[in-house]
Design a protein with these regions (language model features):
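Active-site nucleotide/adenylate-binding loops and adjacent lid/helix of ATP-dependent enzymes
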Residues: 1-10, 73, 112-197
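ATP-binding N-terminal substructure of ATP-dependent carboxylate-amine bond-forming enzymes
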Residues: 1-110, 114-116, 120, 127, ...
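ATP-dependent carboxylate activation and anion-phosphoryl transfer catalytic cores
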Residues: 2-4, 10-13, 33, 245-332
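A short, N-terminal amphipathic alpha-helix
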Residues: 26-37, 176, 180-183, 258
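Hydrophobic beta-strand scaffold residues
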Residues: 38, 103-104, 132, 152, ...
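A glycine- and small-aliphatic-rich helix-loop capping segment at beta-alpha/alpha-beta transitions
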Residues: 95-104, 170, 175, 305-306
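Phosphate-binding site of ATP-dependent enzymes
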Residues: 169-254, 275-282
Length: 332
């Protein structure tokens, strides 16, 4: 049986460039060479695309030297975009792949763009009857008004990994927090603080998505689940499953799958929720390309649910090919 040729996209222009490379290395190490002919395409911080020459070898492939000569990728069966943040998770690369007619893993153009924008995402979920935190959106020049009291959160609308996010405790911290967020985006959210347990759920599938066991996020040595607690070794504990009643765990899983469906996601997502007051589930965010190392939350959640990392990759590639086959029959 011929091997599938898989192109792994890594890097990107966002502040999550290094996180993307770490995820891609794990993918390269885990794709079975007996099944897949893997090539790597790294996108530099300057937007330059470089083709790896190591045939998928981690040591030879990443990072790709900036002075690499132009090269032709050739035909591929499926693209695995392991890109986080703007210019990778926001529908831009997905649009390019759609134009090229190439199968790719993960959400499509519209779902990627929608879920990247925390403001629009919350509005769509709220209109669909799913509970979300209250928020207001600011553009440059808008008056800064916090209607929720303190503490609250200030966030760039379209960035991940908690980059540019501040937990604000009083009026004196609000202005600088908004200024920081505007360094990263042209739209900023002020969001109410939810005093609850933070849980995350993996979702896998196309038209029939399934949820993993949830995992509770417990920051260690940090006031909240910020960038440092996400990526510092020992920055947080992940408790799978959370110490919650079975009915609440099922409610979290249903909310995650419904958020996936409402936003018309495909392939994969990690849905972040809060459980407030022991039983009220609030959807916070949906990540269409979650961190993807073997020790990332998404992979751990499915491993605990009986889907090991290598099998998870295999299923995602199969889902991408299934979607491409389905769409190839459409008449435009």
């Amino acid at each position: 049986m011929a091997r599938l040729r898989v192109a792994v996209l890594a890097g990107g222009r966002s502040s999550e460039h290094d996180i993307s490379l770490a995820s891609a290395r794990s993918v390269l190490e885990s794709l079975d060479p007996a099944e897949y002919d893997v090539v790597t395409v790294a996108i530099g911080r300057d937007g330059r695309w470089e083709l790896g020459s190591g045939g998928g070898s981690v040591a030879e492939t990443l990072p790709i030297p900036a002075a690499s000569a132009p090269a032709t990728l050739g035909a591929v069966d499926v693209v695995l975009p392991i890109l986080h943040g703007p210019f990778g998770e926001d529908g831009t690369v997905q649009g390019l792949l759609e134009l090229a007619g190439v199968a790719y893993v993960g959400a499509g153009v519209a779902a990627s763009a929608l879920c990247m924008d925390k403001d629009l995402f919350k509005k769509v979920l709220r209109d669909s009857g799913l509970p979300v935190a209250r928020h207001v959106a600011l553009r440059v020049g808008d008056a800064i008004d916090n209607p929720f009291g303190y503490p609250c959160f200030v966030k760039p609308a379209r960035l991940g990994s908690s980059v540019g996010i501040s937990k604000v405790h009083d009026d004196g911290e609000l202005g600088p927090a908004v200024e920081l967020a505007f360094r990263h985006d042209e739209k900023v959210l002020i969001e109410e603080f939810l005093d609850g347990i933070e849980v995350e759920v993996g979702v896998l599938g196309n038209f029939e998505p399934v949820a993993s066991l949830p995992g509770q996020i417990v920051p260690l040595g940090h006031e909240w689940y910020d960038f440092a607690s996400k990526y510092d070794e020992g920055g947080m504990d992940l408790v799978i499953p959370p110490d919650l009643p079975a009915a609440v765990i099922e409610q979290v899983q249903r909310a995650a799958v419904e958020a996936f469906r409402v936003t018309e996601c495909e392939g994969m997502a990690r849905v972040d929720c809060f459980v407030v007051g022991g039983s009220r589930v609030v959807v916070n965010e949906l990540n269409t390309i979650p961190g993807f190392t073997a020790t990332s939350v998404y992979a751990k959640l499915f491993d605990a649910s009986g889907v090991p990392y290598e099998e998870l990759l295999r299923r995602l590639i199969a889902l991408a090919l299934e979607r491409q086959e389905r769409r190839s029959k459409l008449q435009y």
